């Protein structure tokens, strides 16, 4: 802002009612100055500027002395003699540098103002007059801002110079206050010298000014701002909690030091009482000298007097030096603080890395979206593949969490987390304190570093100890008579204080002697039971003697009789107590013996029962063996009789009746089992051929007559029509009854189910069952439910990876398992001609609950690939416990390296009543 050319104007003294009104003290919005100049026919002071509210400045004036005012008048007269052109080219900064510096009210400290006001009457100081226009006040309210942005002016001033100007004002006021008191210390003289230099320096640079500018709109706050704000709140909260914990540790350590000092205090009391007596005489001798000291000399330190401000600074330095020597507990607390700081820094780094990871994830998502836009087919295939594998992994993870984490480890994890929660809070305590030297001074909320050190126990709290004072210089002669009453009062106070100290020393010595006597008596009492009894007897004896001197002789005899009776009663009670003790010991011994016997009997009882059971079984076996011997002899006799009878029957045809001849004769009339099986197989083939031929010719089902004729044509006679119907019906019934004729309690349609959370991983093929534009949409795979469904055909099975797997089945009801059926397709139906994926060795376990890790074994079996496709396996014995959950554990297969197939698994048994 370009201000109009301005110079100071002083109206002539001859003008009537000259008020010294100048344009500098008027507003740019009034015409009073123009009217004043027109009325008195004065030369215009300066051109009227075009001012706005942005260019308004705060104008203040400082107090001037008479010499300064004369200098200003001379300067004014000089400036009036200069031509108008020179006045126009002169800048505002040059004119202000030539005048007396004026500093802003905002730079003037409250302390300097109060001091100058309080000493105005004594020192005849001219107070500063602040001239501010109401329009300027409104501008200050509306235009002031805290953003570091300057606009609308071309003379900003020097901020550093402004600070120096403020120092100058404070220094002048401090010097004036010190001179008004009539006393100046060394530090204040140094301050005065410094302010003189600053005054000269500030006169060169000129006055300062405050800039008022319009408020600007703040920039929009992003996500990083709020994240930093959240981190700051977390830091401050953790720091506050850590400060509380550390301060609590400090209080505990101070309490421990208090107890230690208390123990040491009792040992040093005797020595201190003697030293206090010696020091008391020295204090009396020193009292005379202190009584003659002046009030100014009592506040001297190292031979120099100090004012109140210097005393406060000196006390602060001593206090800081005292706190710098921290004891061992403070060092321990500091070490803990540094540990918390290091941990907090690691936590901050972890949060920053997490934020960086989030940013990288966002970039990855953006790249995936761009890929979807550029190559939709490839992106769709990758997305479906990723979703499928991700869904399977998610289900597996949930199953693992449900089985292992939530059911087994959740309670332990909760307990450990509760224990680690305070440690985690402590670890986050030093987030904002890394790299600082003093831990306690940086605590934001509970900053208790200014606490006074705890007073030791051996220090006397209720009295002033006389101590050696530093040697004071000879007193200076003061000619002011007003200080003599103060010196006399101070001497009286010191004398009374010394007397009180002496009295306290005497009382402390007496208390120390009494404490020593009491300690001796306590040591005597602590020597043992004999010392205690002796002390009690002495006290009782003294009391009895006193009572004997006071009471009459009758009372003494009564007391003696009462004492004798009391002793007799005590002796009786001791006898009874001794007897009770003996009886209780005997009872205790008997009780221990009975417990030992009972324990041994409890251990021997199962063994005895087992031995008795074995003896009974042995007797039973002996009786059965004797019966078998009798049966053996009877069988031998029967065999001999039969042999004789056969020989007699065939003795007519055979000479000698040998057994070999009999066997040859029977084999000629009968056939063996193998020959019968071959004949039956041929008969079945012939029957099937005849029935097939009949159906192809007639197109109808065969009748009973056709079946009989087919049997006759096959060359086998002796089978009637009814027998043929029975054979066919039995075969059809067995096939319709699930090929076993027994109830399958694992069948899904009958109420069975699969616990998929404990089954093995399904083996998935890479062949897509459904695809769209070459993108696979659905892969074929069977679930474990196929194992308990009745449909069996090649490929309709559950395959799991490897040769070992698990299958857990929940039965329709609780049963006593007795039989298990394993079914696989035959080799004739296999495309490869073998069934290497069939299970070989497997075991079955009974489980009480689905969370049980190891169940009760029900049997271990082997499936034969060369046998029938449906094979049944029986348990060795009926289990004692009923189960509703059965686990099939496949241990090996017949050689397939990648997977194992299960087609059908049945469970048979007896339901519980």
From Swiss-Prot:
Its main location: nucleus. Residues 1-139 are annotated as: LMNA-binding. The chain crosses the membrane at residues 416-436. It comes from the Eukaryota. Residues 209-302 are annotated as: SYNE2-binding. Residues 751-912 form the SUN domain. Residues 437-913 are perinuclear space. The coiled coil domains differentially mediate trimerization required for binding to nesprins and are proposed to dynamically regulate the oligomeric state by locking the SUN domain in an inactive confirmation. The coiled coil domains are proposed to be involved in load-bearing and force transmission from the cytoskeleton. The SUN domain may play a role in nuclear anchoring and/or migration. This is SUN domain-containing protein 1. It comes from Mus musculus. The lineage of its organism: Eukaryota, Metazoa, Chordata, Craniata, Vertebrata.
